[in-house]
């Protein structure tokens, strides 16, 4: 079984499809390693039936997109699209099953709403900048990270944003309070997952009695204002804001980057929509989390390692070790375990026969 990103399908070398070359070489490894006596292989898709077969029974697919697995169609709460193929030795007369479509897609809210509500961490505040030797040097002040300070800062952001935009004016939201869980921790004792969670049986370990790796990172104060705007905007408009929406509200919401006004990163700050599968969790989440903003404005933060792990369908008892950056990398670089299990069952059936 081999996996790669969907972009592989459009890659070319000397006008030849890289994926076609890979399939050719995998079908006949001896053509690459001349001295080997390797068997030949039949290359199958795990989600589509072949369009036809060669005289020796090898499958033919008219479109390489037949090898793309869209994870959200197979019980994963994430729009993760990857090329995955299955090779079977040609002397084994077996046609593998394909993955079974889920009855319905699982949305983000369904798999993370039962994790404890926690606040964002406070790190530092941007003060000023100057150009030194042609490069911009930015200056920051450290910010005291405690519940009281956080509530004052985020409440002021919410008040300003709602007064200017009218977001949620008709809402009957209760007064914001600090979660008893604060910024969370590497282990938060709690009752999770709930039985209503669509992947309860997969996530749950009754011996765990809590959530691992559920701690928010420290954030730049200016970013928290952007997060508050983004989550309130999303809650009102059912879509996340583009940079032009930030600018329309207030120019001080634009990030201090040259590319802010180029349109190159129009979706740099992205709220994950609660009623849809999440976008692809990648290792880039380790950098700043701007592409993975929590939809709840009362938490005003990016996703934790455990929330990202839920999206990737890691069971709750899977503990990620090392620095938090490394933890995010481990989550983002993985094939979703729930998808891997389904693929493993197909392979297991082949081996049994």
Regions found by a protein language model. Give the residues of each.
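Conserved Class I SAM-dependent methyltransferase catalytic core
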Residues: 1-73
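Conserved proline-anchored active-site loop of SAM-dependent methyltransferases
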Residues: 1-5, 85-89, 281, 332, ...
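Short catalytic/ligand-binding loop motif for oxyanion handling, primarily in non-cytosolic enzymes
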Residues: 7-12, 75-78, 93-96, 289-291
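A generic secondary-structure signal for well-formed alpha-helical elements
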Residues: 9-12, 22, 26-33, 89-92, ...
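Flexible, glycine-/basic-rich loop-and-beta segments that form/coincide
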Residues: 66-127
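C-terminal target-recognition/interaction regions appended to catalytic cores
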Residues: 130-353
């Amino acid at each position: 079984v081999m996996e790669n990103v969907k972009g592989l399908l459009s890659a070319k070398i000397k006008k030849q499809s890289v994926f076609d070359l890979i399939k050719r070489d995998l079908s006949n490894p001896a053509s690459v390693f001349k001295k080997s006596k390797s068997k030949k292989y039949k290359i199958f898709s795990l989600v589509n039936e072949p369009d036809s077969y060669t005289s020796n029974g090898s499958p033919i697919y008219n479109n390489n997109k037949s090898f793309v697995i869209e994870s959200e169609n197979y019980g994963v709460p994430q729009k993760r699209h990857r090329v995955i193929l299955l090779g079977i030795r040609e002397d084994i007369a077996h046609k593998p099953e394909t993955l079974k479509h889920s009855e319905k897609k699982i949305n983000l809210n369904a798999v993370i709403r039962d994790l404890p509500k926690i606040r964002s961490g406070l790190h530092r505040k941007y003060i000023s900048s100057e150009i030194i030797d042609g490069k911009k040097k930015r200056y920051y002040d450290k910010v005291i990270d405690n519940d009281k300070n956080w509530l004052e800062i985020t409440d002021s952001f919410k008040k300003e944003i709602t007064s200017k935009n009218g977001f949620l004016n008709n809402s009957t939201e209760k007064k914001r309070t600090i979660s008893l869980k604060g910024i969370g921790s590497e282990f938060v004792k709690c009752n999770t997952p709930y039985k209503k969670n669509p992947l309860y049986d997969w996530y749950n370990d009754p011996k765990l009695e809590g959530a691992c790796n559920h701690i928010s990172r420290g954030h730049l104060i200016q970013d928290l204002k952007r997060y508050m705007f983004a989550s309130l905007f999303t809650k009102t408009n059912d879509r996340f804001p583009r940079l032009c929406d930030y600018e329309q509200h207030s120019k001080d919401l634009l990030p201090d980057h040259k590319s802010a006004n180029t349109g190159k990163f129009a979706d740099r700050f992205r709220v994950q929509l609660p009623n849809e599968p999440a976008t692809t969790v990648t290792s880039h989440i380790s950098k700043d989390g701007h592409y993975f903003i929590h939809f709840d404005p009362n938490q005003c933060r990016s996703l934790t390692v455990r929330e990202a792990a839920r999206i990737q369908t890691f069971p709750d008892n899977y503990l990620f070790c090392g620095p938090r950056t490394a933890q995010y990398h481990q989550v983002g670089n993985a094939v979703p375990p729930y998808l891997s299990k389904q693929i493993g069952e197909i392979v297991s059936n082949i081996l049994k026969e």
